[in-house]
Amino acid sequence: MTPPRSRLQRAGMSRDIVYFDLETQRTANDVGGWDKKRDMGMSLGVTYSTRLGEYQIFSEKRVDDLVQQLLRADLVVGFNVINFDYEVLMGYTVLDLPHQCRTLDLMVDIEKKLGHRLGLDAVASASLGVGKTGDGLDAIRWWREGRVLEIAEYCCFDVKCTKLVHEFGATNKKVLYDDRFKQRKNVAVEWVV
């Protein structure tokens, strides 16, 4: 039996899943602590839209366009997007993004099941055999050095890893990770694409 078609499918439109990540201009230490994420400033934000089939890179000047794309999405998928990326973006808008965007935060979902956090690199490396190409501190250093292209490449790769982890989990109903003893484990997920 085939599942019923969604309103979008009946209208001939595909569901728009928007994969999202951003990098910041400043560290938590620079702004006085992790409770001041809204002061970190976005250096670049990157999305991948399944409806458009393309990546988009947003500078700080285009943050309103980024927010609008997230609000219009049928689903926003990110890794630590609720407690980090949205908090940074809320330094630019009065909108309550965690409550106004339909969101699947892969890290939060995994944490609920395991009782502890995993990083994107741990899940992507074990599930896909590919790891991250840097970290947020690299991106901040590149920002200070004016190396915006490196930030864009790094952030695009993180968005791609997030997309591939989501698709892997949706297909296999689990994702893999290596625990602190380097033992390969898996965690069941109920994600859909």
Which positions does each model-derived feature cover?
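Short, amphipathic C-terminal "tail helix"
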Residues: 188-193
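Acidic active-site catalytic centers that drive phospho-/nucleotidyl reactions
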Residues: 21-23, 105, 158
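A polyampholytic, Gly/Pro-enriched intrinsically disordered region
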Residues: 117-133
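Conserved DEDDh/DEDDy metal-dependent 3′-5′ exonuclease domain
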Residues: 50-122
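Conserved RNase H-like, two-metal-ion catalytic cores of nucleic-acid enzymes
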Residues: 2-71, 75
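Short, motif-level signal for alpha-helix interfacial/capping segments enriched in acidic residues
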Residues: 2-3, 82-84, 136-137
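Acidic, Mg2+-coordinating catalytic module of metal-dependent nucleases/exonucleases
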Residues: 128-187
